[in-house]
Amino acid sequence: VPVVVVRGKSLTTNVDKMMELLGQILNHTDYRDTNRLKELLMEEKAAWDMSLFERGHSLVMQRLMSYYSKVAKFKEQGSLSYYYFLNELVATFDENSSIIIDKLKQVASKIFVKNNLTIQEVGGIEERAAVSKHIHLLIDDMLEGVPCNSTYFVFEDSVVNEGFLSSGKVQYVARGGNFRQHGFSYTGALRVLETIVRFDYLWKNVRVLGGAYGAFTQFATNGD
């Protein structure tokens, strides 16, 4: 289930301050500060630019699985697709800042409301009592809102072969599918096969003989 999680931690004696701070952030954030908003977007993009090559293999695998798995397609929206979305936001921010601000306000008014709020507390009896006592600092100014109905996103399967150009010299190549869609089921034997393929075949032929940085395979219980 897709959720937005806002976390905070404090000493028991400071729970009131934490609740007040969370309340200010959720209920009174000023989205009209275009300079600060642009700074945050550029910081987010810079972080992705720096880490993109470090997790190239995972990005490629997520993109690959999104071709044939609806769940993976949804998860991939926060991966490489998100990076391209972020690039577009930064590149067009000056001319589209008012639209972006309106969208943020709309999303906040739907998410940060009492009717969609779930509170989880970790601690002992004293901590729970402190949270119960000061929770009003978080929710007093929160809109009532309306319960959000479940929205089903339709993701069509797409058989795509694609490549992405980067300034790095390391290539990440992936190939995969879902074996359950071909009539096979998951058993413990696949763990053995995974080890054999990874270390006896791929390691020797791709890593040792081919000179690549590494190669691996994996079989998930859902068939991916």
Task: Report residues per predicted region.
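Short amphipathic beta-strand starts and helix->beta connectors
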Residues: 97-107, 207-215
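His/Glu-based metal-binding/catalytic segments typifying zinc-dependent metallopeptidases
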Residues: 7-12, 116, 120, 125, ...
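Intrinsically disordered or highly flexible coil/loop and linker segments, enriched in small
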Residues: 28-35, 50-58, 73-74, 110-117, ...
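Non-catalytic, conformational "gating/processing" segments within enzyme and secreted inhibitor domains
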Residues: 71, 100-135
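Short acidic (Asp/Glu) and glycine-rich catalytic loops that position anionic groups and cofactors
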Residues: 2-3, 19-20, 81-85, 112-116, ...
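Acidic/histidine-enriched segments that form metal/cofactor-coordinating
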Residues: 2-105
